Amino acid sequence: MSEPELKINSQAVISAIERVCAALEAQQEYLTGLDQAVGDGDLGITVSKIAAALLEYVHTTPADDLGRFLGNAGMIANRAGSSTMGTLLATALMRAGKEVKGLAELTSANLAAMITVGDTGIQERGKANLGDKTVVDALHPAAEAFVASVQAGDNLNEAGQKMLTAAEAGRDAVTPLRSRSGRASWVGDRTIGQVDPGCAALVIILKAILD
């Protein structure tokens, strides 16, 4: 007899957000350095503001409806981080929340659906394509890897590790390229060989979730 599927409850979601916030705070200087090389250098302070706002939110807000909880978290992120990263993170959280409205627990299928709509939302909102050297180059292969792993019957840990590996590979694949989208594209060849800050932030987030 197969074991019952592991479900993710509200406390696990809160704990994951707490780990993500702590990781982003810890990597603030690293992300600032990456962003200074190719952009306006505000990514570190932006993620720090978002992390502080989200921590306050998760410590004071019931999470009995994870859809509503995540959707509101997206609005908090958008208000706290008035930048591209804040907008994209908010879009992903709000799309994911809408996908699981009314649920108190999440299955692997729920998570796969959330990741898929989050990926689609970020691509639509950011108007970036694969190869443009943006967060999409790490996020899209990560989402595809997670969904494929879940559909193959892997457990959540296995699917998560495959997702992280795909995100890291996507980040590394575009590092030698010239940025073709967003503020980074303005500095031209200076972006060649530089790690994309959005890709780097995504990898930090995924590592924290899986920790």
What positions do the PLM features span?
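N-terminal loops that bind phosphate or other acidic moieties
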Residues: 1-211
